[in-house]
């Protein structure tokens, strides 16, 4: 269970965070050399754009942690990443561009790690939605990054 402490920060039930020193990282890199995967089998992505505008509920995986789903007539886009980001190259292109997506009722961002909070993707998608659901204290960062009039609702 994660709760907000008196200083406004979030702490997990187990205090698993610790400070890493440079020598710890160096030791890890030297003792665990990088070995790329031997083969990648890519998923086949079918273009089913017509289903994205249907009235029925659906869930569509857009790659990595990006999802678009419709529930009760509301479309919600989670952690959109449409291109390559540092240290994470897409094995297959995104199945849809932001312009291909139907109107988005809510943009939901889970946290600010670069593979979930991609500034170029957020700038693109901000043209197609006006509402963002965010963790506490993330609204200012999103508005600075996107430079649009997104209405930000911060949730605990």
Regions found by a protein language model. Give the residues of each.
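Active-site metal-binding motif and surrounding structural segment of the metallo-beta-lactamase
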Residues: 88-134
């Amino acid at each position: 269970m994660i709760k907000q402490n008196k200083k406004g920060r979030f702490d997990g039930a187990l205090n698993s965070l610790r400070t890493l020193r440079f020598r710890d990282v160096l030791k890890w890199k030297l003792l665990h050399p990088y070995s790329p995967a031997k083969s990648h089998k890519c998923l086949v992505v079918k273009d089913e754009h017509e289903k994205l505008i249907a009235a029925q509920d659906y869930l569509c995986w857009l790659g990595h942690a990006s999802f678009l789903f419709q529930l009760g007539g509301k479309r919600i886009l989670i952690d959109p990443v449409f291109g390559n980001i540092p240290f994470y190259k897409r094995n297959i292109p995104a199945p849809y561009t932001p312009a291909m997506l139907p109107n988005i009722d809510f943009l939901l961002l889970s946290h600010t790690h670069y593979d979930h909070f991609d500034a170029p993707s957020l700038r693109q998608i901000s043209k197609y939605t006006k509402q963002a659901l965010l963790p506490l204290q993330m609204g200012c960062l999103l508005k600075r990054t996107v430079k649009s009039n997104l209405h930000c609702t911060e949730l605990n």
